Regions:
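PRPP-associated nucleotide enzymes
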Residues: 1-200
Length: 200
């Protein structure tokens, strides 16, 4: 059975192949012949860039209002884009099998996927920012500084856009969650490049 995500990546032009002799540098510091823009599964490059702009502006503002600003845009796109909606449904079904208390996602592209999955599961969402600050939004949509959310002893599924060697996990996501006394029990990525990240 063909994986629909592979088809959707090509349908949304999310896969870019490098020019000969000019490999891409990945965030992980590795070189590679192709680049995957998983955020294009949001519907298109244009739609993804628009949401990235909203995310960047919301990150720069009051972080307690971050979730509402970003999720409002995501909700509209879920209604408008069948590929994005079907992807979130697939990810939600995978996450539903995991014994977790909340969903976490990291700035920026993880939010495309972590926020709607948390909402569909009826779980809270931990938004982790690049400065390692975090905001927890409970299942009712109420946001608070994560330190006030009583997450000690809780387990999350961290939902990522893409994993190569899991450098963002090591550098930021795991320390942020563990700093709250919680644990990333599972990780769910749209794409795992199978370059060692799943071993972390």
């Amino acid at each position: 059975m063909e994986n629909p995500i592979v088809s959707w990546l090509f349908e949304t032009d999310a896969v870019r192949v490098c020019p000969e002799g000019q490999p891409f540098w990945y965030t992980s510091g590795k070189l590679g012949p192709f680049y995957i823009n998983t955020q294009f599964l949001y519907g298109s490059e244009e739609a993804a860039n628009a949401l990235l702009t909203v995310i960047e502006q919301a990150c720069a503002g009051d972080k307690l209002r971050f979730y509402d600003k970003v999720y409002g845009e995501i909700e509209k796109q879920l209604a408008a884009c069948p590929i994005y909606r079907q992807l979130i449904d697939l990810m939600t079904e995978a996450a539903r099998k995991m014994d977790v208390d909340f969903v976490s996602g990291g700035e920026r592209r993880d939010f495309f996927f972590s926020m709607p999955v948390a909402r569909k599961l009826g779980l809270g969402h931990l938004s982790i920012f690049k400065d390692l600050s975090s905001v927890y939004t409970d299942a009712n949509g109420v946001s608070m500084p994560a330190g006030q959310a009583s997450l000690s002893g809780k387990r999350s599924v961290h939902i990522a856009d893409l994993v190569t060697v899991a450098s963002s996990y090591i550098r930021a996501w795991i320390p942020a969650v563990e700093g709250l006394g919680a644990k990333i029990a599972y990780s769910l990525a749209v794409v795992d490049r199978d370059q060692g990240g799943s071993d972390i």
